Amino acid sequence: MAARHFLTLNDMTTAELEDLLDHASKLRKEWRSGQTRDTLKNRVLAMIFEKSSTRTRVSFEAGMTQLGGSAMFLSPKDTQLGRGEPIEDSAIVISSMVDAVMIRTFAHETVERFATASSKPVINALTDEFHPCQLLADMQTYRELRGSIRGATVAWIGDGNNMCHSYINAAERFDFRLNVACPEGYEPDQQLIEQHADRVTVVRAPEEAARGAQLLVTDVWASMGQEDEQKAREKAFRSYQINPALMAQADKDALFMHCLPAHRGEEISADMMDHESSAVWHEAENRLHAQKALLEFLILNRLD
């Protein structure tokens, strides 16, 4: 049987995604009640990091351990995909020794090429184009706190980046409307917008995007690798901050989410992390449980 990969949300059907999120919620309850699992006993996850991340490493490594398996960390010094050895050669060799491979890198093409040659499941833990693992955590969090997101309105405030792209995919998979508020020149990928034009609206005013929304989401103004653009981005995004005033435009029961790390005083006001609408800490923990469910699904080809 050919390996299943998770490079974008489109690699799973809506039914598969919803089953996975239900299982993730079950895993969260088990873990919080002290139950243990060994469904991935003696299984090994290779974690290739060309972009560093606290949450990604901790959640995947802890997740494999909690399921009875293990994870190995490979830094840029250990791998250097495509520099010296072709990506495809690395994929063939690494996948012959482990049970799954997680990659966090820059170019989305890197994970696509790796997956094509890999005999084991490949997980996109973030590229410059997509961040599907975070969307699993976000959708799990919304379901746990508010129920089904079907028919809801979600407002993305800020840069049309990889997180925004994954929210566009999620709008189709989970059947919600997405309003994207961003300054000119920072829009999401135009082809992606056109493919989902029936669900996605791009506007300039954050207030317009947030009006009546059930979920407000944002990310940093300058992502990793864009540090030299920081000043220009601060100027462009100055009015694209999620704060209590913007939350007041949303539905009275609206949630606020952020994938972290958050820059207080920039994309969010200092008081938003602990605002009554904030689901950020719940969302952050769910990276662990959503990814455990994903690992079981891909490695075992089932959800126990």
From Swiss-Prot:
Which amino acids does the record list as binding carbamoyl phosphate?
A: 53-56, 80, 104, 131-134, 259-260, 287
Q: What is its main location?
A: cytoplasm
State the InterPro entries in the record.
Asp/Orn_carbamoyltranf_P-bd, Asp/Orn_carbamoylTrfase, Asp/Orn_carbamoylTrfase_sf, Asp_carbamoyltransf_Asp/Orn-bd, Orn/put_carbamltrans, OTCase_ArgI
The protein's GO terms of the molecular function aspect are: amino acid binding; ornithine carbamoyltransferase activity
Q: Which reaction does it catalyse?
A: carbamoyl phosphate + L-ornithine = L-citrulline + phosphate + H(+)
Q: Where in the cell is it found?
A: Cytoplasm
A GO cellular component annotation here is: cytoplasm
Q: Which UniProt keywords apply?
A: Amino-acid biosynthesis, Arginine biosynthesis, Cytoplasm, Transferase
Q: Which residues bind L-ornithine?
A: 162, 219, 223-224
Q: Which domain of life is it from?
A: Bacteria
Keyword field contains Amino-acid biosynthesis: yes
Q: Which Pfam families match?
A: OTCace, OTCace_N
Family annotation (Gene3D superfamilies): Aspartate/ornithine carbamoyltransferase
> Enzyme group, top EC level?
transferase
Involved pathway(s): Amino-acid biosynthesis; L-arginine biosynthesis; L-arginine from L-ornithine and carbamoyl phosphate: step 1/3
EC number annotated for this UniProt entry: 2.1.3.3
What is one process in the GO biological process aspect for this record? Answer: arginine biosynthetic process via ornithine
- Which HAMAP family does the entry link to? OTCase
Its biological function?
Answer: Reversibly catalyzes the transfer of the carbamoyl group from carbamoyl phosphate (CP) to the N(epsilon) atom of ornithine (ORN) to produce L-citrulline.
**Family assignment?**
Belongs to the aspartate/ornithine carbamoyltransferase superfamily. OTCase family.
The name of this protein is Ornithine carbamoyltransferase
